[in-house]
Amino acid sequence: MSGMFYECSSLKELVISNFNTNNVTDMGEMFYGCSSLKELNISNFNTNNVTAMELMFYGCSSLKELNLSNFNTNNVTNMEYMFSGCTDQFKNKIRAEYKNIKEEAFNE
């Protein structure tokens, strides 16, 4: 799923509740550059096997709502710059809501 929606800068909404992510290991750059995306619910994603989430939401500067409530990040070894390019207000909200996100995810 790496780079699946890469640079889809006109994408404003996305319904991906039926995605089967059971065998996915790489979600890096998945929503990279989706600068018009405002909210995203990916709580249904099975992330048990994911090891890479670097740059996943890089440049998602319009993102205000993100549901990661069921994310299992135990096997993730790379979260670098996951939220780089997002607003500080959004990053602070994610930090407060999800304690399992490593600090490297918020690097600029």
Stretches with model-predicted labels:
Residues S2-E108:
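Negatively charged
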